């Protein structure tokens, strides 16, 4: 589930010559933003080093679980009625030895760990908690050492609805530490050093009303899945799939071996607010073939150094981004808290690059270039309609394609000091671009149609921002890099009311 562009050979050659990297391009300008960007979040969710302790005594009416008895938690869960509270004594709790042994909660169960309570999969059991029971709560418990397969998860393995995960430590597992169901709340928890994702928010069914708040999400993708399966798009801190309504706020997302937060395929109505996203090997945020989001008041720094540097060293001319909006935009016909993608009052400091708005001209419903195989836009219920001749005319010409449109980027502060980043080429970009449409042969989007649309016809705007450092701008396609004067002038007319200060930052 990744970018991808398909530049013809001639365009690639031009792009190699035109790419200017971090150097040059900006000039001082006098207009000032109408509203100053907000300050970084004042608190950081430092959950992993100092997790909140659970109760030292069993809550009233709770069933006590003994770590000295293998499988005690699963057995007592099975023999107790729904809505039972379980208190895990201090110590290392285990399941039985079959790899599929797991705890299958009943509706409304509550699991509370005492200080030092650990549920350990011993690198043998695949899953810790599974089943379809709704409204399960897990608090103050460490879950570690489980070996879920790729794309599967350890806690809430079956994506049941209404679970609450609070003050938990989910770490050192394979696969995803945590899956997600509708109305799930993940709060004040540590998702650390898991093999693929901290959380994989995927459900075969409705997944709405997700809250991810006040967590530390760090060090995930220890199994380096992008190297094992190049361009799989299957790793990072958190991956969201077809989530309708999510609040992601107040998290510390750092040091993940890949992307920090990645929403891929028909997500809608996201609020990404007040997070500190830093030091991730890849992008801080990817919002891909999705709709309607607010990204505000985040501090985003030192991201994409690893992936960006590797791409530049390999001669890739694509403007890799710290915030990457790929075939994603505002859509008034889809219900959400906004009908745009609004990116405002964020601080982006010393990342490999800035914000890229991208649209693959060859990626649309029924195209072999659509890496989200079988999926179509949320505007078309019958994918089979997106074929010739109907796709060449309204409304399907518009509705069969995920469009990067109605993106409003304002009141942000963009700081780049290339001596800090250590970049010498192909970094420090903002970008709005597409590729030259070529594929398949029945595509109605061939040529420069999509590049012209995303650049000038789909209401994508930067304005009232502050820039510090040698920023450049990629427009229309990867071969066209311009400086501030051209970016602000005809025909692009971007960053009205913005302030620019050349140099290497404060």
Predicted regions mapped to residue ranges:
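Intrinsically disordered, low-complexity sequence elements enriched in Ser/Thr/Gly/Pro
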Residues: 1-3, 30-31, 499
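Short, flexible, solvent-exposed loop/turn segments with mixed acidic/basic and small polar residues
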Residues: 8, 19, 54
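Extracellular parallel beta-helix/beta-solenoid repeat domains
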Residues: 41-506
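C-terminal region of N-terminal signal peptides and the immediate post-cleavage residues
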Residues: 17-43
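Positively charged, low-complexity intrinsically disordered regions
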Residues: 4-6, 33, 250
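N-terminal export and membrane-targeting signals
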Residues: 1-12
């Amino acid at each position: 589930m990744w970018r991808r562009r398909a530049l013809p050979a001639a365009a690639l050659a031009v792009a190699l010559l035109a790419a200017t990297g971090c150097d040059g391009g900006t000039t001082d300008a006098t207009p000032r933003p109408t509203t100053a960007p907000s300050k970084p979040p004042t608190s950081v969710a430092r959950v992993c080093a100092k997790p909140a302790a659970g109760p030292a005594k069993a809550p009233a009416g709770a069933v006590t679980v003994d770590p000295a008895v293998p499988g005690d938690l699963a057995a007592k869960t099975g023999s107790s009625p729904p809505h039972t509270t379980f208190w895990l004594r201090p110590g290392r709790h285990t399941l039985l030895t079959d790899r599929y042994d797991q705890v299958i909660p009943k509706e409304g169960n509550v699991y509370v760990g005492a200080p030092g309570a650990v549920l350990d999969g011993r690198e043998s059991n695949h899953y810790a908690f599974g089943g379809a029971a709704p409204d399960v709560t897990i608090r103050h418990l460490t879950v570690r050492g489980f070996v879920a397969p790729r794309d599967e998860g350890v806690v809430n393995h079956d994506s049941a609805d209404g679970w609450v995960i609070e003050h938990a430590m989910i770490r050192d597992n394979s696969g995803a530490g945590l899956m997600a169901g509708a109305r799930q709340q993940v709060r004040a928890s540590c998702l650390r050093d898991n093999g693929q994702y901290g959380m994989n928010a995927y459900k075969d069914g409705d997944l709405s009303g997700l809250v991810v708040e006040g967590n530390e999400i760090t060090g995930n993708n220890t199994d380096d899945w992008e190297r094992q399966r190049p361009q799989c798009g299957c790793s990072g801190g958190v991956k969201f799939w077809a989530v309708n309504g999510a609040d992601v706020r107040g998290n510390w997302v750092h040091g993940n071996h890949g992307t920090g937060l990645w929403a891929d395929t028909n997500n809608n109505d996201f609020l990404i607010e007040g997070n500190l996203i830093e030091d991730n090997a890849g992008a801080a945020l990817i919002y891909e073939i999705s709709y309607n989001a607010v990204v505000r008041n985040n501090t985003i720094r030192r991201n994409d150094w690893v992936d960006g540097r590797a791409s530049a060293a390999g001669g890739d001319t694509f403007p890799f981004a710290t915030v990457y909006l790929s075939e994603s935009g505002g859509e008034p016909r889809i219900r959400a808290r906004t009908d745009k993608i609004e990116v405002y009052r964020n601080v982006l400091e010393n990342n490999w690059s800035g914000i890229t708005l991208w649209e693959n001209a060859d990626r649309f419903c029924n195209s072999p270039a659509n890496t989200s195989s079988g999926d179509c836009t949320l505007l078309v219920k019958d994918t089979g309609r997106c074929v010739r001749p109907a796709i060449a005319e309204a409304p399907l010409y518009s509705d069969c394609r995920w469009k990067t449109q109605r993106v409003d980027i304002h009141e942000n502060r963009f700081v780049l000091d290339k001596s800090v980043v250590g970049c010498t080429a192909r970094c420090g970009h903002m970008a709005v671009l597409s590729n030259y449409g070529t594929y398949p042969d029945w595509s109605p989007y061939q040529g420069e149609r999509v590049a012209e649309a995303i650049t000038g016809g789909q209401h994508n705007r930067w304005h009232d921002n502050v820039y510090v450092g040698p920023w450049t701008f990629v427009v229309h396609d990867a071969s066209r890099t311009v400086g501030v004067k051209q970016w602000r002038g005809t025909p692009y007319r971007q960053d009205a009311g913005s302030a620019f200060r050349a140099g290497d930052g404060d």
